[in-house]
Amino acid sequence: LGIGDEGSILGSIPHGVDTFDSTFPTRSARHGTLLTRTRGRVNIRRSENSTLHEPPCWECACRLCRHHTLSYLHHLDKAREPMMWTLATEHNLHYMGWLMRTQREKILNDEV
């Protein structure tokens, strides 16, 4: 469909689109991008992440955010460790699930 990033989804929902099939969260993860509530898109490959000993998103309850830091993820990516892509994919899918739950609540409350 080509509708998969946050902006496209949020722009489509008010027009009645309620089904999305996209590789965006997994492709973003493979390219080192984490989708977060508090920081927006985080490019784990940026050098400043090598010294940030904090989770990618404080508000996220996924395994990556509960147990790993940006500096560790940066290290995994630099080492081309497949675990980085697995954790990032899981996180991005968790984020997209959260995004859709919040939109569903807004629809039920007539806020969209």
Segments (PLM) and residue ranges:
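C-terminal extensions of enzymes
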Residues: C57-V112
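Glycine-rich phosphate/ribose-binding loops and adjacent secondary-structure elements
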Residues: L1-P56
